[in-house]
Amino acid sequence: MLELNKDARAIVAAHADKALPVEGVPALNYSREDAVYRTAKQAALALGFIEIDAECVALAWQAQVQRTGRFDVQAWPDEPADFGLRPWPRDDAFPACPKSLGLYAVLPTALWVGRMARAGVPTVQLRFKSDDAAAVQREVQAAVDAVRGTQALLFINDHWREAIAAGAYGVHLGQEDMEIADFAAIRAAGLRLGLSSHGYAEMVRADALSPSYIAMGAVYPTTLKRMATAPQGPGRLAAYARLMRDYPGVAIGGIDASRFGEIRATGVGSLAVVRAITAEADPEQAAAHLMARWAA
């Protein structure tokens, strides 16, 4: 068991809603001598945050105490400046999208994109997986064509070059894509940019690019994609949403209608669904039900 000082134990007790199971005894690696930093690092690791996220929390807690002049175990850090985020407005920001993207359907083909756009889903994403460059180009163009005449906002997952060429509304990229994407070209083309995140360190990294929105998750267990981090849960999602309040936030991962109340309570304005639509016998009816539940 990780040895905690008294204040670290108090932080853990006060923020049990953010706790995830801890496997083994996490190593305590300190980058600073500051007592507040060390206390917060202990607490964050005990709550199950991975090392890089625990470091972010610890540094932010130290900055919070330096800024306010007081240490309060109840005051989980959520001030952007304490995490080193730049103030808004920003000259280098990507084009804005609606603060609430509503129901956000992640779909495998252009055919699905067209069906959900015509069903009134406000935001759709084409997540088309293929190693055939020509097939990708055709599918992206077909998705752009499929949303014409509807109010749906179309994001293209991964394929940013094809999204630019086809004139999509935006592109969504994962953290791994940030190493290779030409963000200057995406911005110059006027596309909106959505970025995935799975914890504090990745949110801070995403913020450096001033994207149009930030997706946060996975909130609940999902079988659709192998995740590097454990499901974050609604407690952490609420903390992430408070920190990233200047962005439209999108909750993703294992979400269905039964979870809407928990998601809404976090303050996140949008939620992404996959199987809650594509696995249903009547996807259009399922989409209508989900939109009505989210709006209720």
Residue spans for each PLM region:
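Acidic (Asp/Glu)-rich catalytic clusters
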Residues: G114-G120, V144-G149, I164-A165, A184-A188, ...
